[in-house]
Curated annotation (Swiss-Prot):
Subunit record text: Monomer.
Record localization: Cytoplasm
Protein name per Swiss-Prot or TrEMBL: GTPase Obg
Residue span of region Disordered: 126-149, 376-406
Domain Obg: 1-159
Gene, per the UniProt record: obg
EC number from the UniProt entry: 3.6.5.-
CDD domains: Obg
Enzyme class: hydrolase
Chain sites annotated for binding Mg(2+): S173, T193
Length: 406
């Protein structure tokens, strides 16, 4: 199944049913009076987080969704039936954005969580409602109100405790295969991983965490090189980042320089994400003579000015992987306890999470704007005159850019 993490859809809630105008007409009953019923409310549109879904592909081709209208009122004071609500299932971790205002309507982060994105129209009133002491036979009714309609952008960010960073062929997929039951494709060429992969790491019988592997970054990713930085958004909700470095690259490149590339690209994408706790994992150390390993480790730590934890592993032979998994589990438990006991720390983390979300969304929007400029033949914003209506929302002749990552 294709992995789709961004879609645009249109939702329309049901209109309210019109009120009914009718009068009681029975044999031997004169001037029976009004008996027109109210209409039914229109159905609303909800998004519901479904833990069995992991992609937005269902909304790639079907983009317009309408809830049921309310039925009109009936005679004998019968109220029209309410329109049926429309419930659209989405993967857990979906962010819902109003396209018109760029406002984040909500995040669906728990299975079964529901979010109303379009409210059904209010029912119309039947003529019975307007009966009074001075108006015994009202002929007034009201129509149902139209339901809300919205253009929405759905963004999926995978939910994981730990995220893996590194250049292509750094061994991220091999690492996730070594520590979990996930089986991502592994090969000796760049960009083997094209979509995020999730793996559940079981440390003890009742202790586990989720790790996410995203496609590798290369130098210039922030400008769109390689697979770009679009997949970095999937690390926004992680609690810890593991920076994997290939210590024995086939092209004999400098591991320290390769690690610095990732650090620089991460900072360009989101300075707040670069503040997330990060551990350095030196992979493929089994290919380095044992008497040289400590010196290699000390050299890269010194050149990077690294202050955080450093681990030496060999993912393919699983050397050192059990230790790092237990340390990760301990880190996550201590972090959760501190959040529960220290409100100041919890607030600081919440602010950091919000900054990461805001910066990631702004950066990705900037990339989409640049792509739109290039496709329109404009090289840069400086080439647009002040009187140019390129960004005029009322100009229907402008290009429409819809980005979907397969």
């Amino acid at each position: 199944m294709k992995f789709v993490d961004e879609v645009s859809i249109f939702v329309k809630a049901g209109d309210g049913g019109n009120g009914m105008m009718s009068f009681r007409r029975e044999k031997f009953i004169e001037k029976g009076g009004p008996n027109g019923g109210d209409g039914g409310d229109g159905g609303s549109v909800f998004l519901e987080a479904d833990e069995n879904l992991n992609t937005l592909i269902d909304y790639r081709y079907t983009r317009k969704f309408h809830a049921q209208n309310g039925e009109k009122g009936g005679s004998t004071d019968c109220t029209g039936a309410k329109g049926e609500d429309l419930i659209l299932p989405v993967p857990v971790g979906t962010t819902v954005i109003d396209v018109a205002t760029q406002e984040v309507i909500g995040d669906l982060v728990k299975p079964g969580q529901r979010l109303m994105v379009a409210q059904g129209g209010w029912h119309g009133l039947g003529n019975t409602r307007f009966k009074s002491s001075t108006n015994r036979a009202p002929r007034q009714t009201t129509p149902g109100k139209p339901g809300e309609s919205r253009d929405l952008k759905l963004e999926l960010k995978v939910l994981a405790d730990v995220g893996l960073l590194g250049l292509p062929n750094a061994g991220k997929s091999t690492f996730i295969r070594a520590v979990s039951a996930a089986k991502p494709k592994v090969a000796d060429y760049p960009f083997t991983t094209l979509v995020p992969n999730l793996g559940v790491v079981s440390v003890d019988r009742f202790k586990s965490f989720v790790v996410a592997d995203i496609p590798g970054l290369i130098e210039g990713a922030s400008e769109g090189a390689g697979l770009g930085i679009r997949f970095l958004k999937h690390l926004a909700r992680t609690r810890l980042l593991l920076h994997l470095v290939d210590m024995a690259p086939l092209d004999e490149s400098d591991p320290a320089e390769a690690a610095q590339v990732i650090i620089d690209e991460l900072g360009r994408f989101s300075p707040a994400l670069a503040e997330r706790d990060r551990w350095l994992v030196l992979n493929k150390m089994d290919q380095i003579p044992e008497d040289e390993r400590e010196a290699r480790k000390a050299d890269i730590v010194a050149r990077l000015g690294w202050q955080g934890p450093v681990y030496v592993v060999s993912a393919i032979s699983r050397d050192g992987t059990e230790r790092i998994c237990r340390d990760i589990m301990h880190y996550l438990e201590v972090r959760a306890e501190r959040i529960a006991e220290d409100p100041v720390f919890a607030e600081e983390l919440a602010e950091l999470d919000q900054r990461i979300e805001d910066e990631a969304r702004a950066r990705l929007q900037a990339l989409d704007d640049q792509r739109a400029l290039r496709k329109s033949g404009v090289r840069s914003v400086d080439d647009i005159d002040e009187d140019d209506d390129f960004f005029d929302d009322e100009d229907d002749d402008g290009p429409e850019i819809i980005y979907v990552r397969d």
